[in-house]
Amino acid sequence: MTDYTICPACHKENSMKEKYCLDCGQKLIYDDEKEIILENKLDIPKDKIILLDLNYTLISNSWPIRHDEYPGKILNRQYEHELVNKIKDNYVILITASPDYTAADSLKHIEENTDLRIAESYWNFGNQRPPALKEYWLKKEVFPKHGNDPSKYLAIESNEDTRDMYAKYDIKARPKWDFIKKNKK
């Protein structure tokens, strides 16, 4: 397991016990264990509202560009085109721990480099951790606009703690590897 006291993305100090940067939401601790990957990929129903994670989900090269400075970090992003093809006909809400000052450039880059059209997006406005931040946006924006019927939603989310938060609301939340093939490195 690798621990950081300095965030590799924003270079802010974090205590050794933090799993995610308090400033930008970057994952700080990576387990060396292999994640369980479904052999038979799941379908994504077209009637679902997709609650989409940005880093480590839509972005395919988050780890290699984690040290890049803005705006280069945005310009160097590559996307999971197999995932994009599976969700491009859904209503997609991007909810990310990325800082709000990156929103306009990030959305422009996604639009210019994929067939995905983000219907709504919600960003980190401070030092919020991903699960707390995404729960905030879920309760403040998503549920008031779209209702709180969990069967309407599917969250595609890299962060296990955030998937657990969605589960509190009975929203199915899965990592991208349940839907697409893992790239061989």
Where are these regions (language model features)?
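Short, non-ligating residues that shape and space the ligands of small metal-coordination modules
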Residues: 16-17, 30-31
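Asp-based phosphoryl-transfer active-site loop
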Residues: 47-63
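Acidic di-acidic motifs
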Residues: 16, 53-55, 156-158
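Non-catalytic pre-domain segments flanking phosphatase-related domains
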Residues: 4-11, 22-24, 31-52
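Short, acidic loop-to-helix structural element flanking the phosphoryl-transfer center
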Residues: 45, 65-93, 100-104, 128-139
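Flanking scaffold residues of small Cys/His-coordinated metal-binding clusters
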Residues: 2, 15-16
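Conserved Lys-Pro-Asp/Glu-containing loop-to-beta segment of HAD-superfamily phosphomonoesterases
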Residues: 133-161, 166
